[in-house]
Curated annotation (Swiss-Prot):
Localization, UniProt: Nucleus
Catalysed reactions listed for this entry: Thiol-dependent hydrolysis of ester, thioester, amide, peptide and isopeptide bonds formed by the C-terminal Gly of ubiquitin (a 76-residue protein attached to proteins as an intracellular targeting signal)
Active site residues of this protein: C51, H287
UniProt GO BP: apoptotic process; protein K48-linked deubiquitination; proteolysis
Enzyme class: hydrolase
Chain's role: Hydrolase that can remove 'Lys-48'-linked conjugated ubiquitin from proteins.
Protein name: Ubiquitin carboxyl-terminal hydrolase MINDY-3
Membrane spanning stretches: none
Keywords recorded for this protein, A-Z: Apoptosis, Hydrolase, Nucleus, Phosphoprotein, Protease, Thiol protease, Ubl conjugation pathway
Modified residues annotated as Phosphoserine in this record: S125
Molecular function as annotated in GO: cysteine-type deubiquitinase activity; K48-linked deubiquitinase activity
Pfam families assigned: MINDY-3_4_CD
Amino acid sequence: MSELTKELMELVWGTKSSPGLSDTIFCRWTQGFVFSESEGSALEQFEGGPCAVIAPVQAFLLKKLLFSSEKSSWRDCSEEEQKELLCHTLCDILESACCDHSGSYCLVSWLRGKTTEETASISGSPAESSCQVEHSSALAVEELGFERFHALIQKRSFRSLPELKDAVLDQYSMWGNKFGVLLFLYSVLLTKGIENIKNEIEDASEPLIDPVYGHGSQSLINLLLTGHAVSNVWDGDRECSGMKLLGIHEQAAVGFLTLMEALRYCKVGSYLKSPKFPIWIVGSETHLTVFFAKDMALVAPEAPSEQARRVFQTYDPEDNGFIPDSLLEDVMKALDLVSDPEYINLMKNKLDPEGLGIILLGPFLQEFFPDQGSSGPESFTVYHYNGLKQSNYNEKVMYVEGTAVVMGFEDPMLQTDDTPIKRCLQTKWPYIELLWTTDRSPSLN
């Protein structure tokens, strides 16, 4: 086993994981990218864990399908269209992970020649044909196990995007086989570079996949969404006790919302909350799903008031709803507002008439950006994807369609049930109401 493979295993699974990393956890991650029989463009997830890779791939696949494809019927995909969609999506994610866009890409594959011999000896019977062995080896996870699988992988490098695209297409059958998700994950990690990832992760000793529960870390999700393996979801970097905590530095193509924000465990910044396309990964305590729409008006450019709210909140990292009055000048400069000392003092007195030494967000926005509501339509068609069969209506992996109504205020006449998905979406649209076409709300788990 090469030194690089050992480093990769340590980064993904942790140092103490190798001997016993529970083969159960490893087996949960050993699946390919497989399309649902009930929904031509939806990927299936067989067990808990690999949603950290499958959900981002699904989100980028939808971006390609809805906003770059000329298909009139986006829910019908032939096998050839599935192949093209998946391969283009994998290339897009690899391209965004490529450090400084250096043009150096990696693909990790399985040494099939060795695998044939290994599998034959493991199963105790000689291979009757290479095709048969290839099929059996793709299913032989339990026999291969964690250590042996990692002894059989190899890396190939490519210097240009066209070369990479050809190779990804050539290896299409590999992406669908039993190890496709892991091989793609390893390809992303080596394209990014192990050292680069360690420099971005807050705690490099924490593995990307939890060795006990098998869930992917936030760093892993962020890497696939943005190309950066940072551990936080806020905008920009922050300092805490002299330590620099890295966040998201630019608007993401695909967004991220989490139930953890509704439960007040974290706050997602606007770079993830307001992405370039109306597609969001939605996180619960244990699973990732995808919420999306086809209406680009949902991601219209930030209104000045929304930009002001975002900037104000960067100076209010604890989400108190106020800043010390000493920071008012910095906020006004960041927003290109008049910021000469005399005017600043005038504003301090106006916004803090009681002399408490704080500036509240509400009065600040009302003073400088009055009557500017949030942009975007009031009603729109939405869809939800969950890759787990057992979590879907009728146990079929299909998009659930619904109508979302977004008001600028609470309307008791429109109020719908309080569900986890609604609570999660309220972190983006506080007064959203949802009406689904199925008998029950889609599950986040």
